[in-house]
């Protein structure tokens, strides 16, 4: 199985013979800012080493800033990495997610054999998560994935709705 997250500029160029503006990943069409280029140059002497896989220094600084134990902080190589780690750690049996939504959720969940329950967002609701989403959260659902803002629709779920979703998850034992 081959999972493609996005940002496949080489595939697009090979298929169409030209470059495209790609908004499928957090890639800037403007190139690297000078500050980032300078940081890369400063980091070159350490480029022959893998970074600390446990991110000890980063977790320590975040813990101090946030007033939390470092053990409560998980760092990863982007959101997709963290989503896969969550799926591998929790191994849920059944998950609820809005559709369409960020493809990494379903990819990660399918990797661990999780059954997917998709709540189809309606064009008539401007593809927003509505009260009907709550009806799909029941005791058979172990985990609910909600993207904020939703990807690819760009819709924000208002705080009151997020709070209702959290309450419903708590009632049903879902995370």
Residue ranges and their predicted role:
Residues 123-175:
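Active-site phosphate-binding strand-loop segment of PLP-dependent enzymes
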Residues 26-29, 79-80, 102, 148-153:
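Short glycine-rich anion-binding loops that position phosphate/pyrophosphate groups of nucleotides
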Residues 88-146:
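PLP-dependent aminotransferase-like
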Residues 1-49, 146:
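N-terminal "arm"/small-domain region of PLP-dependent enzymes with the aminotransferase-like
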Residues 38, 42, 64, 84, ...:
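Short, well-ordered alpha-helices that flank and scaffold nucleotide-derived cofactor binding pockets
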Residues 51, 63-85:
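Short loop-beta-helix segment that forms the pyridoxal 5′-phosphate
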Residues 46-49, 71-72, 92-95:
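Short active-site oxyanion
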Residues 31-33, 83-84, 105-106, 153-154:
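Glycine/Thr-rich phosphate-binding loops of Rossmann-like dinucleotide-binding domains
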């Amino acid at each position: 199985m081959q999972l493609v997250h996005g940002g496949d500029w080489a595939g697009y160029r090979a298929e169409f013979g030209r470059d495209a503006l790609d908004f499928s990943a957090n890639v800037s069409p403007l190139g690297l800012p000078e500050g980032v280029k300078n940081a890369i140059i400063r980091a070159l002497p350490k480029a022959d080493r893998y970074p600390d896989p446990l991110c000890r220094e980063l977790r320590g600084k975040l813990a101090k800033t946030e007033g939390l134990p470092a053990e409560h902080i998980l760092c990863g190589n982007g959101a997709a990495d963290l989503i896969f780690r969550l799926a591998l750690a929790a191994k849920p049996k059944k998950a609820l997610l809005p559709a369409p939504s960020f493809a990494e959720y379903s990819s990660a969940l399918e990797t661990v054999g999780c059954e997917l329950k998709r709540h189809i967002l309606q064009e008539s609701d401007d593809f927003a998560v509505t009260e009907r989403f709550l009806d799909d959260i029941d005791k058979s659902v172990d985990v609910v994935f909600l993207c904020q803002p939703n990807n690819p629709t760009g819709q924000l779920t208002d705080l009151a709705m997020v709070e209702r979703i959290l309450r419903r998850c708590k009632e049903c034992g879902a995370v």
